[in-house]
Amino acid sequence: MSRHPMVTRLLCLVFSCLIILACSPAFAGHGAPKAQKTGILLVAFGTSVEEARPALDKMGDRVRAAHPDIPVRWAYTAKMIRAKLRAEGIAAPSPAEALAGMAEEGFTHVAVQSLHTIPGEEFHGLLETAHAFQGLPKGLTRVSVGLPLIGTTADAEAVAEALVASLPADRKPGEPVVFMGHGTPHPADICYPGLQYYLWRLDPDLLVGTVEGSPSFDNVMAELDVRKAKRVWLMPLMAVAGDHARNDMAGDEDDSWTSQLARRGIEAKPVLHGTAESDAVAAIWLRHLDDALARLN
């Protein structure tokens, strides 16, 4: 039976990491079982936009404040982002590289917290990596993975409430707010319409659109036409206000959401703040991390 190319690449990477571990002095010999050493691995898609990076830094600060006795490490799932960061001299390990490094440092139990928005392809790839590292003879004893932002129906409702708490103070009643998600061909794209349902229960002028999924920007425009909107707020539904937020949402290009709104006579008010900058939204990720840590025991 042939393997999916992604699975084959993952296995090759894991085996390469295991060879490195096997040759490491930290794993030489057959001493007594290691004492439990717990760590946290925060995993984001990543961003190459320097102005957007403080959002992730702030998330890391929150995690360290909540768990001051547990070391925190980082990894990034986007290969292209890792390459750009490394070209700038910034350490940017993949999840597999980070887990191998933590095993070499002597960690035995690791809570991996996804900072993705939905359980799409990136999150499921992270699950496969984490499962591959758990229970290896000279690796990590236990690895648990915290859900992404919208991991359950209850999360969708909580995220809707958190987004309402994060709305711009200058927004006037009746002014639509459009949250831009990434979108995906993965079945998890259904999370966006699910979030839309809970937002509409709170405020009928809160809309969800995506760059590559559903609802599309055409769907959003249809809703704005019904509302005869003259002023619309645009906010990223992504952990950071990176390339999509600054170009696809707020850019000067003809196909940006801001430009398309302007051609219809609608004033766009982009807000370049990722969801990881919102304390209310971040609290949901922190709860997922607490659950992941609890599952280590």
Curated annotation (Swiss-Prot):
Membrane listed as a keyword: no
GO BP annotation list: anaerobic cobalamin biosynthetic process; protein tetramerization
Protein origin, superkingdom: Bacteria
Entry EC no(s): 4.99.1.3, 4.99.1.4
Binding site for heme: H124
An annotated GO cellular component: periplasmic space
Subunit comment: Homotetramer; dimer of dimers.
Protein name: Sirohydrochlorin cobaltochelatase CbiKP
Organism: Nitratidesulfovibrio vulgaris (strain ATCC 29579 / DSM 644 / CCUG 34227 / NCIMB 8303 / VKM B-1760 / Hildenborough)
Gene of this entry: cbiKp
